[in-house]
Amino acid sequence: MRVKLGHVGHFGLAVHNPEASAAWWQANFDLDEIFRFDDGIGLSNDNVTIVLTKGRAHPATIGHMSFHVADMKTLRRALTALRKNGVDLEDPGDEIGPEAPGSPHLGLWFHDLDGYRWELSVQDGGRQA
């Protein structure tokens, strides 16, 4: 028997400074603080919970994580907001592109305060472009 995975419940990241990291996430994304503990903070919205724990960040251990957005209009708005907020975006001037060569999905990539790599993507975005 193989176990079918459901939606991601939450994921945890080791970060240098949970307070600074939580502030960064909340300044850039629709996330609310839902709990605190001695060494960390949990942020959440209707789709995801991110637990930021004080520790040594290891961004190279995760290639990247991707969040889907509704459509290309939303992705373009996100790009504008991230630029305005000074977020470390990949491929300056040509930020939106295929998730992988030949993929119909379009996205953009950025890095958080600890160097973790993230993606915002639109499924079948190439058809909407």
Annotated model-derived regions:
Residues 1-20, 49, 62-65, 124-129:
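N-terminal beta-strand motif that seeds the catalytic metal site of vicinal oxygen chelate
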Residues 1-4, 8-16, 44, 57-129, ...:
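Vicinal oxygen chelate
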Residues 17-32:
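Amphipathic alpha-helical segments
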Residues 20, 38-41, 100, 128:
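Short glycine/proline-centered loop/turn elements that form peptide/ligand docking sites
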Residues 30-36, 88-93:
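Short secondary-structure junctions
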Residues 32-63, 110, 117-122:
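Conserved short beta-strand elements that form part of the metal-binding/catalytic scaffold
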